[in-house]
């Protein structure tokens, strides 16, 4: 995936910039035929905001884990287990994106400046981008280029998973 610094942002800016609401977040097997997990639940809460100059802020949460701590305390004084339960149901990152195209279609690279997972900071989040019109509204499907590792507790053998994020 060579981008040759041929950023296509100006060509697609009018179709991509704006606020996007998450419709689904599913983890598929490597063939993308079977849903293996829905890590943020059946109705995930998510927003992606993309500015006209390419600043991306993505926020995704499992609504069943996103609420007041059971103790009623604020995060700053809640116990570690309570805070971890909520925090592990949230995924956020932001940074500037660049948009490219290769033989497989559009993809963007976001240089991560801030993230809920400190391991992402300074790295690249690369997503395949599919733009469509559905019922007169714009639709965007994002697929990570790299496999994502998640712990899945089951008696089934380990399966490679690819998330499909539809916005």
Tell where the protein language model's regions lie, with residue ranges.
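Lipid interaction determinants
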Residues: 1-92, 99-167
């Amino acid at each position: 995936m060579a981008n040759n610094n041929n950023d296509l942002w100006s060509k697609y800016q009018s179709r991509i910039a704006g606020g996007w609401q998450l419709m689904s977040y599913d983890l598929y097997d490597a063939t993308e035929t079977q849903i293996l997990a829905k890590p943020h639940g059946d109705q995930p809460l998510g927003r992606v905001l993309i500015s006209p100059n390419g600043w991306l802020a993505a926020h995704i949460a499992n609504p069943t884990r996103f609420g007041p701590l059971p103790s009623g305390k604020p995060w700053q004084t809640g116990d570690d287990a309570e805070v971890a339960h909520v925090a592990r149901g949230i995924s956020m990152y932001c940074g500037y994106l660049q948009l490219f195209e290769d033989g497989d279609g559009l993809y963007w690279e976001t240089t991560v400046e801030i993230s809920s997972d400190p391991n992402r900071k300074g790295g690249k989040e690369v997503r395949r981008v599919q733009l469509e019109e559905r019922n007169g509204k714009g639709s965007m499907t994002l697929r990570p280029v790299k496999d994502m590792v998640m712990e899945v507790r089951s008696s089934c053998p380990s399966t490679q998973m690819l998330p499909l994020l539809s916005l």
